[in-house]
Structure formats: structure tokens, C-alpha cells
UniProtKB/Swiss-Prot annotation:
Keywords: Cytoplasm, Lipid biosynthesis, Lipid metabolism, NAD, NADP, Nucleotide-binding, Oxidoreductase, Phospholipid biosynthesis, Phospholipid metabolism. Sn-glycerol 3-phosphate binds at K106, G137, S139, K192, D245, S255, R256, N257. Pathway: Membrane lipid metabolism; glycerophospholipid metabolism. This is Glycerol-3-phosphate dehydrogenase [NAD(P)+] 1. Belongs to the NAD-dependent glycerol-3-phosphate dehydrogenase family. GO terms for molecular function: glycerol-3-phosphate dehydrogenase [NAD(P)+] activity; NAD binding. It is found in: Cytoplasm. Its main location: cytoplasm. Its EC number is 1.1.1.94. Signal peptide: none annotated. The active site is at K192 (proton acceptor). It is an enzyme of class 1 (oxidoreductase). It comes from Salinibacter ruber (strain DSM 13855 / M31).
Amino acid sequence: MSSITLFGAGSWGTAMSVHLASAGRDVVLWARRPEVADEIRRTSHNPTYLPELLIPSSVYITTDLEKAAEASDLWGMAVPSQQLRGRAEHLRPHAHSGVRLVALSKGIENETLLTMSQVLDDVFESVPSDQIGALYGPSHAEEVAEGRPTAVVAAAPDEGEARHIQKVFMTERLRVYMNTDVLGVEIGGSAKNVLAIAAGIADGVSYGDNAKAALVTRGLAEIRRLGQALGADPQTFAGLAGIGDLVVTCMSPHSRNRYLGEQISTGKSLDEVLNDMAMVAEGVRTTRSVYNLAKHHGVEMPITEAVHAILFDDKSPRKMVKRLMTRSAKHENWLPTTLQQ
């Protein structure tokens, strides 16, 4: 029987604990807040995230970081992206060369512009780089928790490590594919949250299906451009962590980032919307990171630039859409000269 420790009792950590426990895995779920851990122990429900979900008694809940770390050599990191480094630094003394790390949260660190697996690699010097991977794809926590059919991708630099992640997480309800392009998987799975905000804005101002289709298609093109500039395999963006994750995040009522964009379109300020949301919308901070990555590498990402201007420069959504629609004419498969070489 495989064992795993999940760090983070948010919606994804909670959903994954139920999924893995249902598959017969030994699961330890680490919660930062004692009151959350106490409530889960008492009621078998997380009071804040997915409160309707019944958490099996076989899931061991703890707030003791050392105890959680020592319970398994496979650690699933489900804390919010901008908190990952801090949590990892607290865990570092308990890591060793036999530990495997799986990034479950999606995002790009604001200060360093590193992906989640890169942050883990930066912090955990005692863990070999090829033992650090990610599990990404079109997978809303609500549906995974309910056991609805879902497909994701396990990415690790070494195929054997990717296969190990696949073996632990895969069940008849969660199909897991493998990929060794960790960078491409993480860029696709993170940058799509920026496009989801744009999709929500489009929904909020009732631009219709044509606009949404254009947004998803051209959004994928700019994510792929960024990925190629960073050295990712362009084929990855045609997979689950690329177009798959982009479609579900832009279309689903479960998407926090799409919802945030919809609320922004009503004239609310970003602070107002965030204060009203109980759960983290990773796309806000990821917008800063993707915008800065694109600038640093000279990659044109007009939709990302528009979302950045709306969120942080108080630009009108309608005016930014007009700017996008009146850009100079281009070939559909246009690429910067640097990416054609």
C-alpha cells in the first residue's frame, strides 16, 4: 500500500486526500490552522473548503509538520503558490535524498519567476532534482472529490519518477498520463489561470461564444509562445496541462479565476472581489508573474497584457478588448523571429 503526505488542507489538498484514501492509500493531511484540523477530526468535514465533502476517518489529520514529514517519503505540496517557498523552508530540515516531491498547486512565484517544482528544487538541496515532479491537468477539486472521471498528467524529469507518481495517484476515476516536460506542464497549468480571468471578464460583459472561442484559441497560442521561449516542448500545450486545463478553467462554473474575472467586469475593484472570495484565486498573482516572464524573454502576450492592465492599472475591460481587436493584422501561425530559428 502506497503512502503519501499532503501539505495543505485547502480545497485541492482536501479533495486529493479523499481521492487517495478511497483508493486505499495511507494518507496524512497536514493543516496549518489547528481549528481546521480539530473540526475535520470532530466532524469529518473541512469547515472552509468543500464543506459538503465527507473525509474518511482513515485520513490522518495533523498540524505537526515534523510528524507529517516523517509519515511518508512522498510529499504532495498543495499549499498556495506564493506560500510554497515559506512552507518548504520549514520542511527542509526533515527532507532527505529518499524523499519524492510532487507540486500540486499551480502558479509561478512572483519574486523569482520560478515554477512550483523549480521552487522546490531551489529549497530542497538534499532531494535530487529528478525526484521533483508535478501533477497538473483539468481537474477541479469539486469533481475529483466527487469521483467524477478526470484525466491529469504526472510530470517529472525522469520517466521512472513520473511513472511512480502515476502509479500512486491513478485510479479508475482519475486517469494519469506521464510527461517528462515538467516545465511545459507547469507553464501551461499556471498561465491558463490568467486566461481564465479574461474568460470571466468576457462572460461578464456578455461577449458571447465567438469571443470565448477566440480567447481560448489565441490564449493557448501565447502560452505556447512563452513555453517555447523558456525551452518547453510545444507539443505539451496540446495536452492535458495545456489546452485541457485551459478549456476547463475558462468554461467551468467551478473556476475561481473565471469567477473573479466575471466580478471584475461588473466594476468591482480587485480588492473588493478578493475580500468576498473564501478561496484563493491563483490567477491574480500568476498574472504578475506571467506578464514579467513575457517581458523578460521578449514574448508577445497581448491577452495577458490586457488582463494585467485591467487588474493592476484599473483599465476598462471594454477598452482593452477594443485594443486587442484593433491590433495590427497577423498570420494565424505567427511567431517571433527568435522562436522560428
